[in-house]
Amino acid sequence: TYDLHKISDLQPVAGQLVFGAEHEFFTQEGSMKFGPFTEYYDLHFKDAVSVDVSLKYAAAEKGSFDVTEVYTTDGLNRKAGLVVLEDDKGFFPEYNGAFLIREDTLTRFAQSAPNLEETLDLLAGKISNEDMVDMTYQVDVQGRSADEVAAEFLHSHGLLA
C-alpha cells in the first residue's frame, strides 16, 4: 500500500507499478497520451497494459494493473475502489460541463417553451463534480434510470416541483 494523493507521488514508486489504460491512450497522436504524460511527470512504470475501453474498470478491479487514467466524475471509479489522484502539475485539462443548444432548437420550441434558455440557465453552476460522481454511480452501477436520477437531483435543488 502506498500513500498517494497526487500524480507526482507516483514518481518514486512507479517502477513497482503497472499502468493500464484503453488502447487509444497509448497511441502516439495527441498531447494527452501515455508518452507525453509519463514524460511530463517523469514516470517510469514497471509495465504498461493496453485494454479495451469497455474492460478497463473490470481489469482495474481484478488487479490487472495498478494505475490508470479516468474521468474524475465517473461513478465507476467508486465501484472499482479507485483513488483519484490530484493532477498537481496540471497535465490534464479541466473539463467543465456546459449546456449547448442549437439556435434552431430554441426557435422550434419558442411557442411551447418560450423560457427554455432561461430554464437551462438555472442549472448553471449547480452540478458539482461530486454530484456528477453520485449521479453516474447511481445510473452506471446501481442501475437506476437516468431520468429518475436527474429528476431526483432537480427536485432536491428546488428546480422541479
Features from the language model and the residues they span:
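An extracytoplasmic/periplasmic, membrane-proximal ligand-sensing/linker region
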Residues: 26, 30-32, 36, 40-43, ...
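Bilobed "Venus flytrap"/periplasmic-binding protein-like clamshell domains
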Residues: 1-57, 130, 144-148
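Short beta-strand->loop
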Residues: 80-94, 98
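A bilobed periplasmic-binding-protein/Venus flytrap-type ligand-binding module shared by bacterial periplasmic
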Residues: 1, 96-112
